Amino acid sequence: MKEILNKQAAINFDELIEVLRRLRAPDGCPWDREQTSESLVPYLLEETYEIIEAIEDGDIKTLKEELGDLTLHILFQAELAREAGQFEIADSIKHISEKLIRRHPHVFDAQNGNQDSDLNMSWEKAKQKEKKRENLLDGVPKKLPALNRARRIQEKAANV
């Protein structure tokens, strides 16, 4: 069953990319063609907040729809990068898969499996090493809303 679901997800994913490319084509939708990474940021944020609201409300139907909307915006950003010759969505997907494996040695590394008693600290150490950050706070996005930023700083400080 898992393999069938993965195949269907891949088919649906490819279809969505083709729909997006058709919308961006010269004979596609004028609105979609004129969008830039920057012009889409407000919509990206809005979709993210709509997902949060659906989760907090326990509204599964809306969550399903909003996850689709956010997926569109992620693919839209990747399509803009592809059009500019910067990278392909496959590069982003490969990168996140590799990163998850690196940051979960307790799951994927048979020699070191389940050796880390503090998984959060292990994650942060791996992240700091990969990103070559000066300190743990370097990775807290400056654009986060103030309360979210304060929470992330507190979480990171608690691991020191």
Stretch-by-stretch model annotation:
Residues 1-66, 72-160:
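Flexible "arm" and connector segments at domain edges
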